[in-house]
Design a protein with these regions (language model features):
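General nucleic-acid-binding
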Residues: 1-17
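Nucleic acid-binding interface residues in structured DNA/RNA-binding domains
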Residues: 19, 23-141
Length: 141
């Protein structure tokens, strides 16, 4: 027998997250973000904060995020590869939208859920996939 708790017994963060995901997967833009608190290094958290700024249905490159992080840290430059590493350690995919990050020139690369999943999420958000290079092999298809 499966015991399902009453809605008022489910923690608020789980109710908010479920509501957010229901809205998102219905093809709509949620107008709130659950109050999640992922754990990670200061650098990773900074990158994840930048990911949360990417609007629904939009993309950004690893290099652009690197520039934003460098600006915040008050340094001249930041490695796009270092940003890619932080993006790859995102513990809350979809809500922290790492699928909206693409390589230079629109290459769909580096998504833990696989490139086909990244493609599906971007399509759900209304992106025209004809503008992207989608690899046939490799890079976590």
């Amino acid at each position: 027998e499966v015991c399902i708790p009453a809605a008022d017994k489910i923690p608020l963060i789980l109710r908010e997250t479920r509501e957010w995901l229901d809205i998102y997967f219905s093809g709509k833009r949620p107008d709130f973000t659950p109050a999640l608190a992922p754990e990670g290094s200061e650098f990773r958290k900074m990158v994840w904060e930048e990911l949360l700024k990417i609007p629904y249905g939009c993309i950004i490159t690893y290099g652009q995020i690197a520039k934003q992080v460098a600006d915040r840290k008050g340094i001249l430059r930041m490695s796009a590869q270092a940003v890619g590493g932080a993006v790859g350690h995102n513990p809350i995919g979809i809500i922290i939208p790492c699928h909206r990050v693409v390589g230079t020139g629109g290459n769909l690369t580096g998504f833990g859920g696989g490139i086909r999943t990244k493609e599906a999420l971007l399509k759900l958000e209304g992106m025209d996939m004809g503008r992207f290079y989608i690899p046939k092999k490799g890079t976590a298809l």
